């Protein structure tokens, strides 16, 4: 395990002013189970959208064609936090309050629970696939990065060396290496899949609170800083650059995604209503700021459907939302 500090060049930039703020269309559907905190949607290979109800212990699927919802009950008290859907249609979810990763077979409704091998790993948080048959995941309060072999069900846990770092958002780069942010540690981290050696990189301002992470086509790491109101980038050579979000320190950026044109989509959860922001990662400028019609309340995670060129997210206003990616960036 290695912590890297003082080895990077830090460049802090002011937020570039957009030429003209345009808006994109945000479509929302009311989830039929009130106050269930729908969150963390994921688009399955068949185009249907799965998500969890964190407060009501369910997984559900939405068909954008028929606009129908279907609910699957999860173990009582599981507190599902996140899910992802494999090519075979099996749904893998994080049992955040019961220290397990679950596997739901939608054809039968049967659920398999894979327990964490260490009692300290009590709260699996966010899951992501790699291309080698694994699921990588964060364990926020337990302070681990985990790897689950989907075939054998073996779980490897790597303890984060920074105490109480609260590893949060996680993504896997094209080379199969997972990258994650430490919400309370003020760092970006990565794990070598071969050796399970963990490396950390300090953010320019350790008081920051990075929530989510995205990786662009150049391999640069992007993140949103919830407390400082910034979007930041760590390049492949270890240099940092940050920009203020449109609402500044009160922006509270949370959910983050990236499209296949390296445009960053994130949600400012500080303003009421919440606001969806599109930021051009190549030109380093804000392209669009759009209020979320339902108000949002908070938007914690989003997913990009490259096949259909759309982002999906869920809101604390009990809605499921879709944003279609513009063919050309607004005001380009």
PLM feature segments, named:
Residues 250-278:
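Loop/turn-rich, solvent-exposed surfaces of beta-rich toroidal or solenoidal domains
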Residues 30-58:
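Beta-strand-rich domains and repeat architectures in extracellular enzymes and scaffolds
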Residues 58-61, 99-103, 143-147, 187-190, ...:
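A short loop-to-beta-strand structural motif that recurs across blades of beta-propeller domains
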Residues 63-67, 105-109, 149-153, 192-196, ...:
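Short loop/turn segments that connect beta-strands within beta-propeller blades
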Residues 297-332:
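Blade-level signature of beta-propeller repeat domains, shared across WD40, Kelch, NHL, RCC1
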Residues 27-31, 68-73, 110-116, 154-160, ...:
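A short beta-strand motif characteristic of beta-propeller blades
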């Amino acid at each position: 395990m290695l912590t890297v500090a003082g080895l990077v060049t830090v460049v802090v930039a002011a937020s570039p002013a957009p030429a003209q703020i345009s808006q994109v269309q945000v479509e929302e559907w009311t989830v039929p189970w009130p106050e269930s905190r729908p969150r963390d949607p994921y688009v399955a290979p068949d185009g249907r959208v799965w998500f969890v109800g964190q407060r009501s212990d369910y997984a559900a699927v939405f068909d954008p064609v028929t606009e129908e919802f279907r609910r699957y009950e999860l173990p009582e008290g599981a507190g599902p936090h996140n899910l992802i859907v494999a090519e075979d249609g099996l749904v893998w979810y994080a049992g955040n309050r019961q220290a397990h990763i679950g596997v739901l077979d939608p054809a039968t409704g049967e659920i398999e629970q894979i327990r964490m091998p260490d009692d300290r790993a009590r709260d699996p948080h966010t899951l992501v696939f790699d291309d080698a048959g694994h699921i990588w995941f964060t364990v926020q309060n337990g302070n681990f990065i985990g790897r689950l072999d989907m075939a054998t069900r073996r779980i490897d846990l790597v303890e984060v060396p920074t105490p109480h770092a609260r590893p949060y958002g996680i993504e896997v780069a094209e080379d199969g290496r997972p990258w994650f942010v430490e919400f309370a540690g003020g760092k970006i981290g990565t794990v070598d899949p071969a050796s399970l050696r963990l490396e950390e990189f300090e953010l320019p301002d350790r008081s920051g609170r990075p929530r989510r992470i995205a990786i662009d086509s150049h391999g640069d790491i992007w993140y949103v800083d919830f407390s400082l109101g910034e979007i930041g980038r760590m390049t492949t050579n270890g240099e940092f650059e940050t920009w203020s979000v449109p609402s500044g320190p009160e922006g509270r950026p949370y959910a983050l995604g990236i499209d296949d044109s390296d445009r960053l989509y994130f949600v400012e959860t500080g303003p009421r209503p919440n606001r969806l922001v599109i930021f051009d990662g190549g030109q380093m400028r804000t392209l669009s700021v759009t209020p979320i019609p339902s108000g949002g309340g908070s938007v914690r995670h989003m997913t990009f459907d490259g096949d259909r060129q759309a982002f999906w997210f869920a809101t604390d206003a009990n809605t499921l939302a879709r944003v279609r990616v513009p063919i050309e960036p607004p005001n380009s």
